[in-house]
Amino acid sequence: MTPTRKINPLMKLINHSFIDLPTPSNISAWWNFGSLLGACLILQITTGLFLAMHYSPDASTAFSSIAHITRDVNYGWIIRYLHANGASMFFICLFLHIGRGLYYGSFLYLETWNIGIILLLTTMATAFMGYVLPWGQMSFWGATVITNLLSAIPYIGTDLVQWVWGGYSVDSPTLTRFFTFHFILPFIITALTTLHLLFLHETGSNNPLGITSHSDKITFHPYYTIKDILGLFLFLLILMTLTLFSPGLLGDPDNYTLANPLNTPPHIKPEWYFLFAYTILRSIPNKLGGVLALLLSILILTAIPVLHTSKQQSMMFRPLSQLLYWLLATDLLILTWIGGQPVSYPFITIGQMASVLYFTTILILMPIASLIENKMLEWT
């Protein structure tokens, strides 16, 4: 008799996606981050829903409503810090997931890759708006600085900024609309994730060797469900350790001070996961140039499939490309570090050098290294 999971229309959908899904037998722990991102999304929506029940999106009451959640609501403190640190874990998983895609050549699955980039941009927008909601000093000034970047757009810039603000400065209307978008975007992310999976299952998963694995596939369940559950437990261990022992570690102390438009913090900076892009923005003295560089630092991912000149999909057997890949990873860590430092010598120079290296590695060095490796293959 045929199992119900193969007959029932709804269960059949789940079955084809998570149970009987043919999966390459050799995918490593780097393939765990997709399911971890799904877990992060569920965690963020759940905790966010409970926070929204007690939050007040108004400039006069937002900060005190956060204090009320933390002090008076049953387990409000853990819900709040799980949501804040859950966002950090979300981005760690996201960066590692993208890093794996770059290393093993998953970007050649164009539809999946492009939807992934849209997902990244949507997640970044959601996180930015969420950071504004507690209405602390860094929330207010972060929102002011980042939304002000729109004024770099010629002719319509100033009008656009005032339109986004809902007035002549960041105030209650800005907070209300940011809360609205912060609430709706995770559901849009969920829909995009479904599309991401749909396109992925059209081609099947990539594998570390970067070769077709049709002749050697196994069912997703029980092999990879067990592997994913192990990954989930390790993820929860790190998240709970962070949340229970050092909840404010990744945040900014300035955000525990109520927003004050008359007092600018000495060093305005976004959350740690945006610092690499923030450094690239600051490295260019021209405002419009900085904004374009900021956008390109993310949108450059769309060019990766075009810049792929190697005859091999994966970097597993390409030592030169591996060297440049880890150079790029180190460069991103340097950019992140510089973003958290004040705008003074030597940090400005280091930031500019790291920014140039970031674009040079992706646009010039990696394609050249791939061509050299192709030649080396011919010599052997």
From Swiss-Prot:
GO BP terms, alphabetized: mitochondrial electron transport, ubiquinol to cytochrome c
Membrane-crossing segments per the record: 33-53, 77-98, 113-133, 178-198, 226-246, 288-308, 320-340, 347-367
Location of the protein in the cell: Mitochondrion inner membrane
Positions of heme b b562 binding: H83, H182
PROSITE patterns (alphabetical): CYTB_CTER, CYTB_NTER
Membrane topology annotation: Multi-pass membrane protein
Protein's UniProt keywords contain Electron transport: yes
Binding site for a ubiquinone: H201
Gene3D superfamilies for this protein: Cytochrome Bc1 Complex, Chain C
Keyword Transmembrane helix attached: yes
Subunit structure: The cytochrome bc1 complex contains 11 subunits: 3 respiratory subunits (MT-CYB, CYC1 and UQCRFS1), 2 core proteins (UQCRC1 and UQCRC2) and 6 low-molecular weight proteins (UQCRH/QCR6, UQCRB/QCR7, UQCRQ/QCR8, UQCR10/QCR9, UQCR11/QCR10 and a cleavage product of UQCRFS1). This cytochrome bc1 complex then forms a dimer.
Miscellaneous note of the record: Heme 1 (or BL or b562) is low-potential and absorbs at about 562 nm, and heme 2 (or BH or b566) is high-potential and absorbs at about 566 nm.
Family of the protein in this entry: Belongs to the cytochrome b family.
Biological role stated in the UniProt entry: Component of the ubiquinol-cytochrome c reductase complex (complex III or cytochrome b-c1 complex) that is part of the mitochondrial respiratory chain. The b-c1 complex mediates electron transfer from ubiquinol to cytochrome c. Contributes to the generation of a proton gradient across the mitochondrial membrane that is then used for ATP synthesis.
Protein known as: Cytochrome b
Lineage, highest ranks first: Eukaryota, Metazoa, Chordata, Craniata, Vertebrata
